[in-house]
Amino acid sequence: MHLHFSRRSISTVAVMLALLPIHSAFSQLQTSATPEAVVQSFYRFHFSHNMDFSRQNVQRRRQWLSPQLLGLLINEFHREDEYARAHPKESFVPYMEGDPFTNSQEYPSSFRVGKTVVSDEKANVSVLLLWKGRGKEGGDKRNLDIQLVREGGKWVINNILNKDNGDDLVANLKREKYLP
């Protein structure tokens, strides 16, 4: 039996074999990433992409979110749709107006990851959000507590708390009525 391989097919196989260890190393890095690294990666992605609260944008961030938080965020869109169907003649502002990941309607200009506290399968990472200031006064600041859990061997974001005003993303998403 005589097999014939083209240079192109041999080159393709060689490239795939060469990339295999890189893919494996990346997968290991993802599962062993620290809570701080996960939060840094999430907000770096978030700040460099569209921050609007939309189904598509939530799906783009799913790799960083716990199944619970992802489910609650997706459910929020269903709740909004149900409310709109039940009140077809009513004009309303959606409950989740703005960006739930920064707890703001006006997007911050930068962020800083701070102190991390790890306890078994849970972690808390402090994040400082910054808005560019006008004049000498400087900008606004907001302190967040990003709560993570270890799921499937990797750290994922499970809740976001605004330390300045006590806002709790998961509690807001679990509220009984769509609009107060």
Which residues fall in each region the model found?
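Surface-exposed patches in mature extracellular/periplasmic domains of secreted proteins
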Residues: H49-R61
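N-terminal export leaders
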Residues: S6-S11, V15
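Low-complexity, intrinsically disordered terminal/linker segments enriched in charged
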Residues: D120-D145, R150-G152, V156-P180
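Surface-exposed, charged secondary-structure patches
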Residues: S66, L70-E137
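Short, aromatic-enriched amphipathic alpha-helices that serve as compact interaction elements
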Residues: S32-M51
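N-terminal secretory signal peptides that target proteins for export/translocation
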Residues: M1-F5
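N-terminal signal peptide c-region/cleavage motif recognized by signal peptidases
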Residues: I22-S24
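Boundary of Sec targeting at the N-terminus
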Residues: F26-Q30
